[in-house]
Amino acid sequence: MGTTSTPRGVRNNNPGNIDRTSTPWQGEDRSVAAIAREQRFCVFLTPQAGFRALAKTLLTYQRKHGLRTVKEIIGRWAPPVENDTGAYVRQVATAVGVSPSEVVRLDNPVTLGRLATAIAKHENGGMYWNADVVAAGIAEALK
């Protein structure tokens, strides 16, 4: 998809800019061509698969690691080594409609969708996906 002026997360169907690991995601493109084109980040076959992976990661943060607030979640998602984490936290908390230290329930599809959308906007400099794409990814993650 697109040219290099298109944000990387959009080109890769990876709205959260999730790093590739040794374990492939459902819907991830592990073809030689995809890996040659993108060495660091996951490339997904569809944007829905990218939103599913983003939401699954956030759910893991809450369920496995006990991260309950936007501040805790974004602190892990976007550590200060590469990011202005404080600004990221404030932007996402505002978009979700909570304070940075307020507990959020990611088993609620509306809250999870708002958080995933806010991260996608921040990572890509805008929102490039419609609400149906986000909702489909969130629904898959919550199954």
What are these regions (language model features)?
Residues 1-143:
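Cell-wall polysaccharide-cleaving catalytic domain and substrate-binding groove, primarily
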